[in-house]
Regions:
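Conserved PLP-enzyme active-site core in the AAT-like
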Residues: 1-127, 132, 138
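Conserved C-terminal alpha-helix-loop-beta "cap" of PLP-dependent enzymes
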Residues: 130-202
Length: 203
């Protein structure tokens, strides 16, 4: 899914098109999580931000890529990776990430459940205009694993003007910051953070 509107691309159909035109398909499963969705079957490379769901704390800067062993480009990918200088993580970061990996399945299950409960609560609230969440997205469901869920992220739009939105945001007793996938609830005014310099133009 995309961030922040959770729009879901039809990865299966795009994969067919990519194969037809001999183009490698690269996807990012950071928001969906490979514990929930099966994107590797349809991708040649899958990127993941280890800063987000994997670490669960948002205090480490790291990422990973998985090469599909069945990809026709696997040898070219390996050669390219061996030819570039990729910065290495420190030993402490690697040890920390290994510790994070021990309970990631438990955390993802909890995040899936908590986010879905919040989604259902918000979509029936009189002050909420729209809730964005992948539960009803056919494209997401087409690659959903048997025991997978819908992830840890949702977005919503409030009814009313900007002043009401500011008052609501400031009153929330939650951690606030630009990340996702933490073990604690985190809220972020995405439009303000991502498009601050464009707001006047957009209005």
């Amino acid at each position: 899914p995309s961030n922040p509107l959770l729009k879901c691309t039809n990865v299966i159909e795009i994969s067919k098109i990519a194969q037809r035109y001999n183009i490698p398909l690269i996807t990012d499963d950071t928001i969906g999580s490979n514990l929930n969705i099966n994107s590797l079957d349809y991708s040649d490379i899958v990127f993941t931000s280890l800063t987000k769901i994997f670490s669960g704390s948002g205090d480490i800067l790291a990422g990973s890529l998985i090469l599909n062993p069945r990809s026709k480009w696997i040898d070219k990918f390996k050669k390219a990776l061996n030819e570039i200088d990729i910065p290495k993580l420190s030993d402490n970061d690697l040890v920390y990430l290994e510790k994070c990996s021990r309970d990631i399945e438990f955390r993802v299950i909890n995040q899936n459940s908590n986010c879905l409960k919040l989604k259902k609560k918000l979509e029936n609230h009189h002050a909420i205009k729209t809730v964005f969440h992948p539960e009803n997205c056919p494209n997401f469901n087409s690659i959903l694993k048997r025991n997978g869920g819908y992830g840890c992220l949702l977005s919503f739009e409030l009814k009313g003007n900007i002043q009401k939105t500011k008052k609501f945001y400031n009153a929330l007793e939650l951690s606030k910051g630009p990340s996702l996938g933490t073990q604690f609830s985190l809220i972020c005014p995405y439009v303000l953070l991502a498009h601050y310099n464009e707001l006047e133009w957009a209005n």
